[in-house]
Amino acid sequence: MQIILLEKVINLGNLGDIVKVKDGYARNFLIPGKKARRATQTAIAEFEVKRAELEKAAAEKLAAAQAEGEKLSGLSVQISQKSGVDGRLFGSVTNADIAEALAGQGFKLEKAQVRMPNGPLKMVGDHPVSVALHTDVVVDVTVSVVGESV
């Protein structure tokens, strides 16, 4: 299916690109999420009329994400979990826990924005974690996991 991207989509393209994707991906994810439209002649004409407005909105989102990223970069978050004698946690610290801890410090984040390349944290100590505020703005945050003795 041919679609017009209404915003930047990772591994697909930028605003205004006409790309071919599988039907299910377009119907179930891109079009309902307002990330794309079908590339018909009328849709292309309507998009060209609204292009400046959409580019301005995308630039505003990027500027807001960069401002938030400046506040967030280099930040350290402390999370307490029950742990054993050897420093391993009973359970783990997930991206939802980190998003909740950052929300406690005044940052509105979804758990999907917290990127943990090595999976959930299972050891006491300091761990680097990436936070994706925008497709172009990724900030590193340090998560300090403190063990509570049982």
Curated annotation (Swiss-Prot):
GO CC aspect terms: ribonucleoprotein complex; ribosome
InterPro entries per record: Ribosomal_bL9, Ribosomal_bL9/RNase_H1_N, Ribosomal_bL9_bac/chp, Ribosomal_bL9_C, Ribosomal_bL9_C_sf, Ribosomal_bL9_N, Ribosomal_bL9_N_sf
Superkingdom of this protein's organism: Bacteria
GO molecular function: rRNA binding; structural constituent of ribosome
PANTHER family: 50S RIBOSOMAL PROTEIN L9
Keywords (A to Z) from UniProt: Ribonucleoprotein, Ribosomal protein, RNA-binding, rRNA-binding
Residues in the signal sequence: none
Functional summary from the UniProt entry: Binds to the 23S rRNA.
NCBIfam families: L9 (TIGR00158)
Higher taxonomy: Bacteria, Pseudomonadati, Pseudomonadota, Betaproteobacteria, Burkholderiales
Protein's name in the database: Large ribosomal subunit protein bL9
Listed GO biological process terms: translation
Pfam families for the chain: Ribosomal_L9_C (PF03948), Ribosomal_L9_N (PF01281)
Alphabetical list of PROSITE patterns matching this protein: RIBOSOMAL_L9
Transmembrane regions listed in the UniProt entry: none
UniProt similarity note: Belongs to the bacterial ribosomal protein bL9 family.
